[in-house]
């Protein structure tokens, strides 16, 4: 990105001192954010492309955003919407992890994943299909999940939790089964905003699957996690923790932090197109959980190596944010359903999706 345009991408840092903070603590807090602002701007200035991001620490008021409400191409990050819909369906008894889905001859598609190399017909459990979709971003598995739950139902689910700009358009590398919106040509497989993708990942991390009994329609009041919720979220969060592609958000965090013990400290889902690299992640810092949704697009580097500039830029931004907010490093022991954050502990004061 050219330095002359930098002002258009300056991050908005929301870190207001809450009532009761001492002056010394408030000054130190702002000093951290000032340093983070400088570092983020330097990373942006060096990148040959565009950047949109949203990050928030869930148990504090740390927040950073750059074009966070701008609709962007999600690439495979839209698969998080499929995962969340599946989680709710399993929790409500309309789907089961061990139900069988069959990949028939001629249904496999190429690109990321491995199922297109397998002989067909092939029978897989729903859990296996979703695991392949998340861990290796398998496109064939994604289409199997879409066939199971339906595009309209998946989109209705995201809309019901306040994600108005998050939309799955079609199956991967398959013709659309009906008319497509006019903006399909711009976004391809799916669209969202960094803020909405972060909110979706937060729903998964907090294990918010059910509305409060009697909650008015359209409200984001979720029931506290119970044992049945946790059982579902344990499975889904395990998929995200075992993400195979770790060259973006985890890249410098895991290699630099030797204090992580007792579990994986990052759960994430990546997305890639020729000119797009993206990652949406939960990062468990010793100071508390963070959600990051970082999108680079219109990138000059179209290469498909681990040193692609978009991937490295995401890694640098993630390291800057996490290091500023959790100088002590990561803590994998806390990456469990609910994220160890009590109801009402987030910066929003509710735990509801923050629009």
For each feature predicted by the language model, list its residue ranges.
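Bacterial N-terminal signal peptides that target proteins for export
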Residues: 1-13
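Bacterial N-terminal signal peptides
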Residues: 11-22
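Beta-lactamase-like hydrolase cores
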Residues: 26-70, 320, 324
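Structured C-terminal helix/loop/strand segments within mature extracytoplasmic catalytic/sensor domains
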Residues: 29-41, 148-150, 200-355
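Mid-domain, small-residue-enriched loop/turn segments at the edges of structured enzyme/sensor domains
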Residues: 50, 122, 143-225
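Acidic helix-start/capping segments at beta-turn-to-alpha-helix junctions
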Residues: 58-59, 97-114, 148-150, 172-176, ...
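Active-site SXXK
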Residues: 61, 72-101, 292
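Active-site-proximal loop and beta-strand segments within enzyme catalytic domains
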Residues: 88-131
């Amino acid at each position: 990105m050219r330095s002359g345009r930098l002002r258009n991408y300056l991050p908005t840092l929301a870190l207001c001192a809450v009532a009761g903070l001492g002056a010394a603590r408030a000054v130190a807090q702002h000093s951290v954010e000032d340093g983070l602002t400088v570092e983020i701007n330097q990373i942006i200035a060096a990148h040959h492309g565009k950047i949109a991001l949203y990050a928030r620490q869930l148990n504090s008021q740390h927040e950073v955003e750059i074009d966070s409400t701008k609709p962007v191409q999600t690439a495979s990050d839209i698969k998080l919407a499929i995962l969340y819909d599946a989680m709710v369906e399993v929790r409500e008894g309309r789907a089961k992890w061990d139900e069988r889905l069959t990949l028939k001859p001629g249904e496999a598609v190429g690109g990321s994943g491995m199922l297109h190399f397998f002989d067909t017909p092939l029978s897989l459990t729903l859990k296996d299909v979703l695991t392949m979709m998340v861990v290796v971003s398998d496109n064939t598995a994604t289409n199997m999940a879409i066939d199971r739950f339906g595009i309209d139902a998946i989109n209705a689910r995201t809309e019901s939790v306040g994600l108005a700009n998050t939309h799955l358009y079609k199956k991967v590398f398959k013709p659309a089964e009906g008319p497509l919106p006019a903006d399909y040509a711009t976004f391809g497989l799916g669209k969202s905003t960094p803020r909405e993708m972060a909110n979706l990942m937060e729903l998964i991390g907090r294990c918010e699957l059910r509305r409060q009994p009697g909650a008015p329609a359209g409200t984001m009041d979720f029931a506290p996690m119970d044992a049945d919720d946790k059982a579902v979220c344990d499975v889904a969060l395990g998929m995200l923790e075992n993400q195979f592609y770790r060259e973006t958000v985890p890249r410098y965090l895991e290699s630099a932090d030797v204090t992580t013990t007792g579990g994986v400290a990052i759960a994430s889902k990546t997305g890639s197109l020729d000119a797009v690299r993206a990652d949406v992640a939960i990062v468990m810092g010793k100071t508390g959980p963070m959600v990051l949704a970082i999108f680079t697009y219109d990138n000059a580097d179209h290469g498909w190596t681990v040193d692609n500039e978009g991937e490295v830029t995401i890694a640098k931004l993630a390291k800057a944010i996490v290091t500023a907010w959790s100088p002590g490093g990561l803590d994998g022991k806390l990456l469990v359903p609910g994220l160890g954050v009590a109801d009402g502990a987030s910066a929003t004061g509710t735990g509801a999706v923050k629009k």
